[in-house]
Amino acid sequence: NIFLYAKGLSAHGSHPEKGDNALYKLFYCLGAEYEIFQQLYHIFVEAPQSIGLDLEDEKSGKLTYNLGSCQIKNKKIVCALDIRFPISYNKDDITSILKKGMPCQVERGLFHDPLYVDENHPLVRTLLTAYDSAMGNKTPSKPIAIGGGTYARALPVGVAFGPVLPGMEAPMHENDEFISLQHFDVLTKIYYKAIKEICFYDG
């Protein structure tokens, strides 16, 4: 028997470019012997645009994808793809694009529609005001749109608010995940301001 091992680097699902996918390395090696792995390497590494994975919009940015797992079951290769797509598309759009572009069977698994709240919504403006006040910012801050999942989707109107601050290390979902006491202290002041602003918001 021959065993092939590849070493990678984990990264948050919304920022796969910060990681190093070990599966791609295996596909590259196996592609020298098996055409199917050549195809997979070409699709996911060399030319993702060939199957429609180059989508983007102005408000939420580019689509990101991560090939999270690959197994061989009953002589079939089964791959799981984590996709974070722009808000101007929906799950049916993405499924249709993949079915047209992929040279294989595509099945839709767990899906969440993107969460987006306009930057001029009162909740967003209130939170930004609280943040700027706590941080002593003279220039108003701008919200950002990212591909990360959030429990805020459980609310009729909700947004993720922190806890990552500019310039601070944020090893989310990684080994030795942590938060410094300095970071925690700053967050306490920000959240105090935010809760107070929301409770006394008069519209």
Which ranges hold each PLM region?
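Histidine/acidic-residue-rich, glycine-tolerant segments that coordinate divalent metal ions
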Residues: 1-20
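Feature marks short, surface-exposed loop/turn motifs that line or immediately flank catalytic pockets
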Residues: 10, 87, 167
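Short amphipathic alpha-helices in soluble, non-transmembrane regions
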Residues: 17-21, 28-33, 91-102
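Divalent metal-coordination and catalytic microenvironments
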Residues: 12, 26, 81
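C-terminal catalytic subdomain
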Residues: 77-89
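An extended, acidic, His-containing surface patch that forms the Zn2+-binding/catalytic region
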Residues: 15-22, 33-66, 71-74, 84, ...
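Hydrophobic residues positioned within well-ordered beta-strands of beta-sheet architectures
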Residues: 2-4, 65, 79-81
